Amino acid sequence: MGQDLTFKRHRRLRQTAAIRNMVRETKLHIDDLIYPIFVKEGEGVRQEVPSMPNVYQLSLDQLDAEVDEIVSLGIPAIILFGVPAEKDAVGSAAYHEHGIVQQAIRQVKESYPDLTVIADTCLCQFTDHGHCGVIEEGKILNDPSLDLLARTAVSQAKAGADIIAPSNMMDGFVAAIRAGLDSAGFTDVPVMSYAVKYASAFYGPFRDAAHSSPVFGDRKTYQMDPANRLEALREARSDVEEGADFLIVKPALSYLDIIREVKNETGLPVVAYNVSGEYSMIKAASLQGWIDEKSTVLEKLISMKRAGADLILTYFAKDVARWLNEEK
């Protein structure tokens, strides 16, 4: 080849693993991870979710062993989802003092006061119709639902939740919850809002885990259209104005562009929710031997951080923590 060619040799910075690590722009840390736990009423329950390998519904007597493992791995935070024994039209178990989530919060905080406990604040797991609000003649009522969400948030804060994470996508839900928390004296409890939550096909396995599928209709009148980008920014701005401290984008993998735009637009900490369908697809493919699970998971989570996520809520958190610890 002639000596008069001029071009940039980018491969110089890829010659060894050490050099590649030195110039790596995005890195994944255990401190980035939040692990979801499904707590279920009953005793001796450790029931694997059929569509989510290695994810379990746990009764309170099984919870300590799970949390012990999480803490030993260095994972800094969990988020709790409740699976109640009884449901009703207004989801009263969601805001009951002795609801399953409230009991789990108290139990975890008593044993591990330094572990950050996030409470998912919604009604769908607790209503007999499976929707995230009050129903009247087949319609989900926005404003009456806000009162119940605020009651739920306050009850969770009283139980000791460090962060409240409202997920139901009613208009004004952050304002209602922030006002409720402040009035009850919980001005220092932050709100991690599901600010941008799409009406996604990727939620199927979660509804299997949380027993939260709607009995009728769907959630498209309150969750977002997957085709919309500008609407996501309007939703995020509204939640910032109403007092949100963190913003969740859900799902994550199909919405990396939204994660970046929300981060640029708001400057608040952004949480990527690596949802159940994303988890189960990788699990299914890896069980068939079609992909390498570890490499695929790490690449996926790195893409979320590269897009702008500060934190990642993922069912892979324990696996990722083990892999990262092995690399130390």
Curated annotation (Swiss-Prot):
GO terms for molecular function: porphobilinogen synthase activity; zinc ion binding. InterPro entries: ALAD, ALAD_AS, Aldolase_TIM. Its EC number is 4.2.1.24. 5-aminolevulinate 1 binds at R207, R219. Keywords: Heme biosynthesis, Lyase, Magnesium, Metal-binding, Porphyrin biosynthesis, Zinc. It catalyses: 2 5-aminolevulinate = porphobilinogen + 2 H2O + H(+). GO terms for biological process: protoporphyrinogen IX biosynthetic process. Its cofactor is Zn(2+). The active site is at K197 (schiff-base intermediate with substrate), K250 (schiff-base intermediate with substrate). It comes from the Bacteria. The keyword Zinc applies. Mg(2+) binds at E235. One of its GO terms (cellular component) is cytosol. CDD domains: ALAD_PBGS. PROSITE patterns: D_ALA_DEHYDRATASE. Zn(2+) binds at C122, C124, C132. 5-aminolevulinate 2 binds at S276, Y315. Belongs to the ALAD family. Homooctamer. Catalyzes an early step in the biosynthesis of tetrapyrroles. Binds two molecules of 5-aminolevulinate per subunit, each at a distinct site, and catalyzes their condensation to form porphobilinogen. This is Delta-aminolevulinic acid dehydratase. It comes from Halalkalibacterium halodurans (strain ATCC BAA-125 / DSM 18197 / FERM 7344 / JCM 9153 / C-125). The gene is hemB.
